[in-house]
Design a protein with these regions (language model features):
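Short beta-strand-centered segments at strand-helix junctions
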Residues: 81-90
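Structured, beta-strand-rich domain cores
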Residues: 90-96
Length: 152
């Protein structure tokens, strides 16, 4: 969904102003230095949450071509979910063992309306550094298409 400038009411003594919503979002941007596979041109995203769709969240590009993903914390999609990050992934995220990371499994709707989450290649975000990365653990323990309850 494209962001547009919005008029801001100004005091009577000042001329009308406008603000760029994207500029405001950019202050909270998560940088993906390598992009997301298939969307490498998109490097900055915002994570949007709303009670209306909780526990789902939306990861939306604020640069590059339009791109947005709906996802869920994989630990909510599958009880006992654990994913071990490689040293390379930890370094790319600027994280260590004490860093609290955010996890995001992309959800897709299949032709019959079944919702599936990609638990094999989650997006991991370091909120302290505002850096994200889609990871692909070597163990391959989890499916790319984990069926969620409900339909689109």
């Amino acid at each position: 969904m494209p962001m547009r400038s919005a008029a801001v009411p100004a005091p009577a003594s000042q001329a009308p102003q406008s603000i760029d919503v994207r500029e405001g979002l950019a202050r909270n941007a998560i940088t993906f230095p390598d992009g997301i596979p298939g969307f490498e041109a998109c490097r900055r995203f915002v994570l949007l949450a709303s009670e209306a769709i909780a526990p789902l969240q939306r990861l939306e590009a604020i640069d590059g071509p339009p791109a947005a993903f709906v996802g869920i914390d994989p630990r909510l999609a599958l009880s006992g979910y654990r994913c071990r990050l490689s040293a390379t992934d930890m370094h790319a995220l600027g994280a260590d063992a004490s860093t609290t990371l955010l996890w995001f499994a992309i959800i897709a709707s299949e032709a019959d309306g079944t919702l599936v989450a990609n638990l094999r290649a989650p997006i991991v975000i370091n909120p302290e550094r505002m850096v994200g990365r889609q990871v692909l653990p070597d163990d391959g323990l989890y499916p790319i298409r984990h069926v969620l309850q409900g339909r689109a």
